[in-house]
Amino acid sequence: MTRLLRLVGLLAAGVGLAWAVDRWLGGRQRPDDGETVPDPIRSTIEIGVPIEQVWVRLAEMERQPEWMHDLKWVRIQTPGPIGVGTRAEGLVRILGIGVGDPIEVTEFLPPHVYGISHDGLFRGSGVFRLEALDDGRTRVTCDETLIAPVLPNLLGLIQAPILGRIFQADLERLRDQLEIEAVTIPA
């Protein structure tokens, strides 16, 4: 019984410490609306195909799981062509946990900007920016912001390096798929 009480006490102290650290981290960032928002996680890559080809693949929501490793599926819920206001539901694995990810397209400027909001348990936003380079290549930059449902400041600090590697690997997978297709599929 004494061991159990010690364990409960340590657990309570750990939760209290995590809460205090989270509040302290949140106090360092004070946006206008009072909600703490972590810095975006930025990933960038250059792809050896023209911007139009990159855009077509990037904007095909239902094919995004082919290159986004932790995105298991996407179902579009809004009829018609994809554009601002299009809603979809996805299943994403965040740090190994399957989570529903309702999204809405917030920016859609072909072939340059594709932005979404995440409206599920993990809230936030993502914006892909495409830039045509002089040699027929395309630079893709992704800024992703995710806000955890509990201890958002502390978990944001912990998740940034992990998710940064995952998001960069996703862009590398997109690049590899597009560059292989450019070589193997005749124009």
Where are these regions (language model features)?
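Short beta-edge strand/loop motif at the mouth of beta-sheet-based domains
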Residues: 62-100, 106-113, 183-187
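A short, structured loop/turn motif at beta-sheet edges
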Residues: 51-52, 79-82, 106-111, 129-139, ...
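Intrinsic-disorder/low-complexity, polar/charged segments enriched in Ser/Thr/Lys/Arg/Asp/Glu/Gln
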Residues: 38-46, 87, 100, 113, ...
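Hydrophobic pocket/interface hotspot
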Residues: 53-58, 64, 88-90, 105, ...
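Hydrophobic/basic alpha-helical segments enriched in Actinobacteria
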Residues: 40-47, 70-73, 96-97, 131-134, ...
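Beta-strand/loop substructures that line and gate deep hydrophobic ligand-binding cavities in soluble
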Residues: 117-169, 174-176, 185-186
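Hydrophobic ligand-binding cavity/cleft-lining segments
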Residues: 3-6, 13-83, 173, 187
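Hydrophobic/aromatic beta-strand elements that line small-molecule binding cavities or substrate pockets
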Residues: 43, 76, 101-107, 125-132, ...
